[in-house]
Amino acid sequence: MSPIVKLLAQRIALSLLLLLLISVVIFAGTIVLPGDVAQSILGQSATPEALANLRAELGVNDPPVQRYFAWLFGAMQGDLGTALTSGQDIAQALSSRFWNTLFLAFWAAVVAVPLAIFLGLLAVRFKDRWPDKLISAVTLASISIPEFLIGYVLMYFIAVKLRWFPSVAMVNDNMGLFEKLNAIALPIAVLTLVVLAHMMRMTRAAILNVMQSAYIETAELKGLNAFQVIYRHAFPNAIAPIVNVVMLNLAYLVVGVVVIEVVFVYPGMGQYLVDHVSKRDVPVVQACGLIFAAVYIGLNMIADIVAILSNPRLRHPK
């Protein structure tokens, strides 16, 4: 087996092991929650016999290990269980909401990634001058403010005062693309501000590191202007760390939209999760947690693979 194949196999195996461990944490965390699931479903007036029958039906009395493996094997086959509060199949209920979350994350990435790279290039071009300092200050301020606060501030000024975009990001299948984009404009703006600083600063740092190379000095001696040196010579050789940090932020965009979906009442997985946490709907919480973990770990694994394939130094064991 070649070193690169072995390294890729190790990354994939570690990701699967991590997902398995997180599934244990998710399951254990939900079963130790206080309260009685049967009582919350049937209400305070339920008889002891009715409560006992429902507990037996839900498998609450089964050993935790048996319940865990039944849940895990079901999830591996696409069976995420049934919502306790509505009786609806969880996989079916999550299908449209999952795509809504991906839709929001995708368009946030479409805006954030090119903007972060452009600002990073601009900061390098004007290193230690006022554009560089201004970009760094604004992006650091955006990452320092809680995202829900940014959401409410934008909602107040842009949606309520200026009435440019709706304050509630409601989308449905009957809406056209531009209608949906208009509806999610504010959530996209908030998510962009949240992830912009990390990607911009990584772009800046990666390019500045490459600018110390000898071939950059050679390019400057050829008479190329500063922008040509940065864009044509430094930027292509700094792609690997930039792609890595972009993938990590894409993972955050998918998993970290929970707060934004709640703020803007967006019909995604985050909103669905919060609604059912308040109802103590354990199967829904477990399913959403497992999906979020799988997406996050999967995108991080892709980031590792891209870093390995794009950097020859990582292809060989140390």
Predicted regions and their residues:
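An internal, D/E-rich "acidic patch" concept
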Residues: M1, N61-I117
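Hydrophobic alpha-helical transmembrane segments of membrane transport/permease proteins
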Residues: L18-F69, L162-A183
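N-terminal signal-anchor/signal peptide hydrophobic helix marking the start
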Residues: A9-S15, L19
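Membrane-interfacial helix-loop-helix junctions in multi-pass membrane proteins
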Residues: A56-V65, L80-I90, V171-I184, L191, ...
